[in-house]
């Protein structure tokens, strides 16, 4: 299980904000990775995207994905980071399916990944 470590990522160079909040060590590690990736033009955690999805009890929910990333080749990608132990959770899979459809309708990509 991921360590729940929250905090501020100060002065990111590729985010339009002067800080970004992280909710876990996985998110913090992804921020470091995005900052160092020469192909990433811009990334943000505070992007305002909310994706509707239906849970196992057929209730509509809303989900805000972890990152919106813009690459130098023009691709816009939503990245969700998860602990490996949660990748196959039924609700995570439902969110993923909804996010993939949402992104496809907007010419974007969706990637779910884990980080060690």
Where are the model-predicted features located?
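Electrostatic, structured charged patches in enzyme active sites and in nucleic-acid/phosphate-binding
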Residues: 1-116
